[in-house]
Amino acid sequence: MSAARESHPHGVKRSASPDDDLGSSNWEAADLGNEERKQKFLRLMGAGKKEHTGRLVIGDHKSTSHFRTGEEDKKINEELESQYQQSMDSKLSGRYRRHCGLGFSEVEDHDGEGDVAGDDDDNDDDSPDPESPDDSESDSESEKEESAEELQAAEHPDEVEDPKNKKDAKSNYKMMFVKSSGS
């Protein structure tokens, strides 16, 4: 151990050239075989620079390097606009969100009474509904009662004159409203 200290005295700077007796840090002199293996070793050690491997460079392909004409731009924009409008129309109409909770299904009357709950199945064409489902729930109860009375009057004009039937229609409507909104 004293021999190693004598060859490198304390406080003296070493020269820039590596010493021959420090073979463990001199990996450049190691015989790795051909140049390819040496490059692989350098790459694995993190010392080698990556070379271009021949893969496609972004923006350097002739199929993607052409520019669209004005007509193509207009056509693409029109298609995107129509798709956007279709999705917004279906979202705002609430056609796909008609369920009110678990186990709830709309009552469909086929015997000619119509929808007492005020659900318009006549407007199932492609035009969007002017009100969203949230807006229709915010209507006052008196307005809904009036609309139910008008529906009953239009469907059964002879029965509306009887006050007992009118009260029954109101109570039926209130019951349907309570069932559909309270889950």
From Swiss-Prot:
There is a cross-link at K13, K62, K75 (Glycyl lysine isopeptide (Lys-Gly) (interchain with G-Cter in SUMO2)). The modification Phosphoserine is found at S15, S17, S63, S87, S127, S147. InterPro entries: SMAP (IPR026714), SMAP_dom (IPR028124). Residues 48-78, 153-171 have a biased composition (Basic and acidic residues). The keyword Ubl conjugation applies. Residues 106-149 have a biased composition (Acidic residues). Keywords: Acetylation, Isopeptide bond, Phosphoprotein, Ubl conjugation. The modification N6-acetyllysine is found at K174, K179. It comes from the Eukaryota. Residues 1-183 are annotated as: Disordered. Belongs to the SMAP family. This is Small acidic protein.
